């Protein structure tokens, strides 16, 4: 599939998500390429007067920068107890609406923000749909730098193949917004995502992992049908 087709899918699904936000809402702003379009479209709606009195809770420095660029007022979790909606992307979505997230190394903040939302809305293009989690994407695990070696051993004992995520435009490991490292862990099979999510988080030194199980309310999928981008909704 061409880059242009993927961009079209991301834009159409992002607009559909932004259109669900109503005036007065507290909105969780996710991280990633598709969610970046959501933030842009929310800014467009504010500028046109279609929306008013919304505030955003960013899940990352990237989301914060984009929200400021497009004129979305921001608050922190010190200011709000709950959110009306959180909109976020995913790296994989299985038929049970379970997710792998964390390609942008923001999954810890995303999981916190998404858990506080009345509705957690996930936006993806069709390439992110898989039959089983772990098919194409490793499970990201945020880990304290001090604990990388013991956590690596513990993840191997769970059947994983951990690899320290390295920077692309800088030498050395990727550092999260919290100042931690990320281990990308491949598993041959994830028969029970809920159990694996708990098992990983029980390892001392792990901050959070990218398995999001039984938390997504609605998945919006951007896809190309007969040459045209359109949106499909999954909510069962």
UniProtKB/Swiss-Prot annotation:
Catalytic activity field: aldehydo-D-ribose 5-phosphate = D-ribulose 5-phosphate
Protein name: Ribose-5-phosphate isomerase A
Keyword vocabulary terms for this entry: Isomerase
Protein family (similarity comment): Belongs to the ribose 5-phosphate isomerase family.
Pathway given in the UniProt record: Carbohydrate degradation; pentose phosphate pathway; D-ribose 5-phosphate from D-ribulose 5-phosphate (non-oxidative stage): step 1/1
Function: Catalyzes the reversible conversion of ribose-5-phosphate to ribulose 5-phosphate.
Class of this enzyme: isomerase
Species in which this protein is naturally found: Thermosynechococcus vestitus (strain NIES-2133 / IAM M-273 / BP-1)
Top-rank taxon, per record: Bacteria
């Amino acid at each position: 599939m061409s880059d242009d087709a993927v961009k079209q899918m991301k834009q159409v699904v992002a607009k559909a998500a932004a259109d669900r936000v109503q005036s007065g809402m507290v909105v969780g702003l996710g991280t990633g390429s598709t969610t970046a379009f959501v933030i842009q479209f929310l800014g467009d709606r504010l500028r046109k007067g279609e929306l008013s009195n919304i505030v955003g809770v960013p899940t990352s420095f990237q989301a914060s920068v984009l929200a400021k660029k497009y004129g979305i007022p921001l608050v922190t979790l010190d200011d709000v107890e709950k959110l009306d909606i959180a909109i976020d992307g995913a790296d994989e979505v299985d038929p049970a609406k379970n997710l792998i997230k964390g390609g942008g190394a923001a999954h810890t903040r995303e999981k916190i923000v998404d858990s506080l939302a009345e509705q957690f809305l996930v936006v993806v293009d069709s390439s992110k749909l898989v039959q089983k989690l772990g098919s194409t994407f490793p499970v990201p695990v945020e880990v304290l730098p001090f604990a990388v070696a013991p956590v690596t051993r513990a993840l191997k004992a769970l059947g994983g193949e951990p690899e320290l995520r390295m920077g692309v435009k800088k030498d050395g490991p990727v550092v999260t917004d919290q100042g931690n490292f990320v281990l990308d862990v491949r598993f041959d099979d994830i028969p029970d995502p809920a159990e694996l999510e708990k098992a990983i988080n029980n390892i001392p030194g792990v901050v959070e992992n990218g398995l999001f199980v039984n938390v997504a309310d609605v998945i919006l999928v951007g896809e190309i049908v007969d040459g045209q981008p359109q949106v499909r909704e999954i909510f069962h």
